[in-house]
């Protein structure tokens, strides 16, 4: 199905270009007896590269079409897509309307922090990956939303600020690679749960 959609979405100029390149391939074959082997190889390469780029374009378009079909199957639909496009806000669990970008960023902080806190610090590779993901989501959140008046008074914002402050306070005293004690983990998880209630 994706291939048919890809062909329907295929650019007419690319088809024209491909049709235009076919005679070049045939002309190269006709001139085969008159040219040296270097030019024969060049002509052959033109044909192969032209055909392969044509097929790659069709395949890529097919994959894009398949991905868009999967998104439609996931329940977004055309109406949902238009609503998402033109409505910058989203209703939270508590019924408030907040910017979608804020909610996405805050939810990512909650998710990555929770995963990081649940990882076993003795499994260094997994622990580092989850900690790095949490740091990155916090950086993104702070760079976009710290001090923003549209969200600064929200409960979720206050709870996430508490989480970030608790982490900063602990690591400034204990050092950047110190393991979090259970009481700090519990406090942070409680704040994350409270923040999630308002997202």
UniProtKB/Swiss-Prot annotation:
GO cellular component: chloroplast; chloroplast thylakoid lumen; cytosol; photosystem II
Compartments reported by the entry: Plastid, Chloroplast thylakoid lumen
Alphabetical keyword list: Chloroplast, Plastid, Thylakoid, Transit peptide
UniProt xrefs under InterPro entries: PSII_Psb27, PSII_Psb27_sf
One BP annotation, GO: photosystem II assembly
Chloroplast found in the keyword field: yes
Disulfide bridge partners, by residue number: none
Disrupted-gene phenotype: A high chlorophyll fluorescence mutant. Impaired PSII function, maximum photochemical efficiency of PSII was decreased, about 25% PSII in thylakoids; severely reduced growth, decreased chlorophyll content. Inefficient processing of the D1 precursor to the mature form.
Residue ranges crossing the lipid bilayer per the database entry: none
Subunit annotation: Interacts with the C-terminus of both the precursor and mature form of D1.
Family as reported in the entry's similarity comment: Belongs to the Psb27 family.
Family annotation (PANTHER family): PHOTOSYSTEM II D1 PRECURSOR PROCESSING PROTEIN PSB27-H2, CHLOROPLASTIC, PHOTOSYSTEM II REPAIR PROTEIN PSB27-H1, CHLOROPLASTIC
The name this protein goes by in its record: Photosystem II D1 precursor processing protein PSB27-H2, chloroplastic
Species: Arabidopsis thaliana (Mouse-ear cress)
């Amino acid at each position: 199905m994706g291939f048919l959609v890809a062909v329907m979405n295929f650019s007419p100029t690319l088809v024209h270009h491909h049709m235009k390149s076919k005679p070049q391939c045939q002309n190269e074959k006709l001139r085969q007896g008159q040219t040296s082997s270097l030019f024969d190889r060049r002509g052959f390469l033109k044909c192969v590269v032209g055909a392969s780029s044509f097929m790659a374009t069709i395949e890529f378009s097919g994959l894009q079409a398949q991905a868009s079909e999967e998104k439609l199957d996931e329940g977004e639909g055309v109406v949902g897509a238009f609503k998402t496009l033109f409505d910058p806000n989203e209703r939270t669990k508590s019924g408030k309307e907040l910017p979608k970008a804020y909610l996405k960023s805050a939810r990512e902080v909650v998710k990555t922090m929770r995963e990081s806190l649940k990882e076993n610090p003795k499994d260094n590779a997994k622990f580092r990956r989850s900690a790095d993901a949490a740091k990155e989501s916090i950086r993104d959140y702070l760079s976009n939303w710290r001090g923003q008046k549209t969200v600064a008074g929200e409960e979720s914002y206050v709870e996430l600020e508490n989480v970030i402050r608790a982490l900063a306070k602990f690591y400034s005293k204990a050092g950047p690679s110190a393991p979090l004690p259970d009481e700090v983990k519990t406090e942070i998880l409680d704040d994350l749960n409270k923040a999630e209630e308002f997202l």
